[in-house]
Amino acid sequence: MLAPGERIDIWADFSKLKVGTEVSLNSLAFSGAENVGGTNMGGMMSSDNAPELGSAMMLFNVKIERKEKETLRLPNQLAALPLLRPEDAVNATQPRPIELSLKGMKWVINGQPFEMNTALPQETVKLNSIEQWEIVNKLNPGAMMDAKGMAHPIHLHGVHFQVISREVLPELAAGWQTVKDGYVDEGLKDTVMVMPGERVKLLMKFEKYSGLFAYHCHTLEHEDAGMMRNYRVKE
């Protein structure tokens, strides 16, 4: 599962394919990001011509037109990553809660819409500290626009993090099975997909820079409707 705003590097080897061969990169069908009990995007920015959410589709096609010689080789060992240990977090037993929900006509984080130059005390961290954050994509049973649950790709500015765990509500397990094998949670990230009813724990170190940094949903309709906040790194 590749979230809006998320990036991965792919090494593709076409050397054994014949000239004229075509290879497609396809997005497979899934249901785990469906708007629970509602319609696509809750009616926001929707179109009758848009494909169904989770539909299979071809992303792009590659055609082999000629043979070339290439000397690039993958290294025997990739660079080691400076991974953190969950137990080293200052709040290892009580992760910082980040709740995503719909409040009236606004998408909010911890019940708060975006404020340009503000970070609340609960959004303030210490420079060089290691923390766990727990992002919860709350279902909204009585939500307007029939938007009871949507996927949120959450992007943090100024820091890279590790995904250390995912949990999903039992009633959403069937949809979860269609997406769980598609996650690439290894390594360091700055964007993570959080499905409806899902709980995701992140581990990160706030180093090098102090100041105000944004964190937000990378679905632009949600970000523009308020699902964006700041956190502050203090020395």
List where the protein language model places each region.
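Short strand-edge motifs at loop-to-beta-strand transitions and within beta-strands
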Residues: 6-10, 190-192, 198-204
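Generic long, charged, amphipathic alpha-helical segments
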Residues: 169-198
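Extended terminal and domain-junction accessory segments
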Residues: 1-167, 205-212, 216-235
